[in-house]
Amino acid sequence: ELIQGSPALALSVIREANRQARSGMSEPAENLEVAITRLGLKRTEELLARLPTLPQLEIPPALRQLQLISQHASQQANGFFASRLARLWQDIHWGSLLFLSPLWPMALTSPQLLEEWERRVIHKGESARKVELQLFGVRLLEICQALVDLWRLPIWVEQGYRLLLNEQRELVKVLRI
């Protein structure tokens, strides 16, 4: 229950299970249940004990905001799709919860970069591509895609970033419908 309520803990457990699985080239753990099964309760407990904790007020607002958005996305996805696609509930839940997780480390270590991006792109209307190249040296979506691949996050997350990076015209067509 503790892990279910904390996106960062869930991400840590899934990443660790996928890191361990990479050497055996098995399929990535797509959800928390599979990750805990692979790690075992003892290793999961040891992992959680090693993770640093911060009081709520010391967590950068950018990270809190991204994690709240992630939790909200998961709740919305569950509300929209879980009853109709019950067999995919886990995929829907973890895919939507972890979609923004590649941004969490940056929000923790360099929140000012994301705040600057938000100020310039969202509020001032500057080109996202131009701002991202100035701030990060590469597109933000490319950073996210690289972390998704490295962490072996669920396929829905991977496909989402591929769509955003490579199929923008198709995405615009779909959204117009």
Residue ranges and their predicted role:
Residues 1-114, 128-152, 157-177:
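Conserved alpha-helical "signature site"
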Residues 111-123:
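Post-HEXXH active-site segment of zinc metalloproteases
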